[in-house]
UniProtKB/Swiss-Prot annotation:
UniProt source species: Synechococcus sp. (strain CC9605)
Protein name: Large ribosomal subunit protein uL11
Highest taxon in the source lineage: Bacteria
Record-level Gene Ontology MF annotations: large ribosomal subunit rRNA binding; structural constituent of ribosome
Oligomeric and partner information: Part of the ribosomal stalk of the 50S ribosomal subunit. Interacts with L10 and the large rRNA to form the base of the stalk. L10 forms an elongated spine to which L12 dimers bind in a sequential fashion forming a multimeric L10(L12)X complex.
InterPro entries given in the database record: Ribosomal_uL11, Ribosomal_uL11_bac-typ, Ribosomal_uL11_C, Ribosomal_uL11_C_sf, Ribosomal_uL11_CS, Ribosomal_uL11_N, Ribosomal_uL11_N_sf
Keywords: Methylation, Ribonucleoprotein, Ribosomal protein, RNA-binding, rRNA-binding
Function: Forms part of the ribosomal stalk which helps the ribosome interact with GTP-bound translation factors.
Cellular component, GO, one term: cytosolic large ribosomal subunit
Family as reported in the entry's similarity comment: Belongs to the universal ribosomal protein uL11 family.
Post-translational modification summary for this protein: One or more lysine residues are methylated.
Pfam families in the record: Ribosomal_L11, Ribosomal_L11_N
GO BP terms in the entry: translation
Amino acid sequence: MAKKVVAVIKLALDAGKANPAPPVGPALGQHGVNIMMFCKEYNARTQDKAGYVIPVEISVFEDRSFTFITKTPPASVLITKAAKIQKGSGESAKGSVGSISRAQLEEIAKTKLPDLNCTSIESAMRIIEGTARNMGVSISD
């Protein structure tokens, strides 16, 4: 018989840098999860993605055991790295803060495809292009 899931916790953590300090400690501690075990497993699984923020979905079971799934980095993080900017524009309608090429857009779409609600690269590219436009990043051909 399958274990009963008590809670699902969603966090966005720096790859390879999870530690028991907030936000990890309080989020897991209230469900009785072994925080250090989670930190070690998460850091081991994400050490090759250093520099990115990796979302994680932790399922906590009634016997206090857990499993977790790592997702792909947020599109906004991938776009800022590709455009070599610190952050998106606060007023995207007024002007562009950077630009990315179609090839970079396609690469980001391929990376994000497993987490997006679509099946083709073209539709994934349109989703990422919309995110870039809202950040004030233009797409150059």
